[in-house]
Amino acid sequence: MKRAIRAAILTVLVLLAAPYVLTLLYGAGQPVSTLMIWRWLTGATVTREWVDIERISPALPRTVVASEDAKFCSHRGIDWDSVRDVIDDMQDGEATRGGSTITQQVAKNLFLWPGRSMVRKALEFPLALWIDLVLSKQRVLELYLNIAEWGPDGQFGAEAGAQYAFGRSAGQLTAQEAALMASILPNPRTRSARKPGRGVRRLAATYVARARSAELQQCWRENSALSGN
């Protein structure tokens, strides 16, 4: 009995430590998400072609940051202001807004499971801090752009999403097309960049404007992959 308990504890510790070790290895390579793995295991279609961030139109990372995580360049993995806003909303009984940073979404997509739960958030927070510590901002964004789901039929990553929506590579996206792709996150099965409705088009226009803000312009200057230099 004691041996079984020790084995169970050891297994849990290994599972908890594995993401931290794998993060060190993910400074290079082309990792896949847990959702992609699950889809493969269930026989669902998965389409993904990895594209280095230098080969992606700068308009896409710019509008993704503008839409998903405006403080991406300045926070250390977690946007504590957004966390406090979510807590305030919960205390006031209001519907909570999404407060996850791009780094947190990378942690979730690479190592955890979809859906909302306190357990997942408890695992996600330290992972996001670790990812930000050991990987560059450019690499974090590159991972995100290549593992996010971007289409209704198993299109993962910017390349598959761009090909599905516009019939062109991620490197050829215009600012408007990039904004439409950013606007369907994180719900590519209910929103469409290929046939955008009024709401998606309105979001896209908002994100194009946000990407031109002074704060994000500073972010682009500090990160060559975003500035197109």
Curated annotation (Swiss-Prot):
One of its GO terms (cellular component) is peptidoglycan-based cell wall. It is a single-pass membrane protein. It catalyses: [GlcNAc-(1->4)-Mur2Ac(oyl-L-Ala-gamma-D-Glu-L-Lys-D-Ala-D-Ala)](n)-di-trans,octa-cis-undecaprenyl diphosphate + beta-D-GlcNAc-(1->4)-Mur2Ac(oyl-L-Ala-gamma-D-Glu-L-Lys-D-Ala-D-Ala)-di-trans,octa-cis-undecaprenyl diphosphate = [GlcNAc-(1->4)-Mur2Ac(oyl-L-Ala-gamma-D-Glu-L-Lys-D-Ala-D-Ala)](n+1)-di-trans,octa-cis-undecaprenyl diphosphate + di-trans,octa-cis-undecaprenyl diphosphate + H(+). GO terms for molecular function: pentosyltransferase activity; peptidoglycan glycosyltransferase activity. InterPro entries: Glyco_trans_51, Lysozyme-like_dom_sf, PBP_transglycosylase, Pep_trsgly. It is found in: Cell inner membrane. It holds the Pfam family Transgly. The chain crosses the membrane at residues 7-27. Peptidoglycan polymerase that catalyzes glycan chain elongation from lipid-linked precursors. This is Biosynthetic peptidoglycan transglycosylase. It comes from Rhodopseudomonas palustris (strain BisB5). The lineage of its organism: Bacteria, Pseudomonadati, Pseudomonadota, Alphaproteobacteria, Hyphomicrobiales.
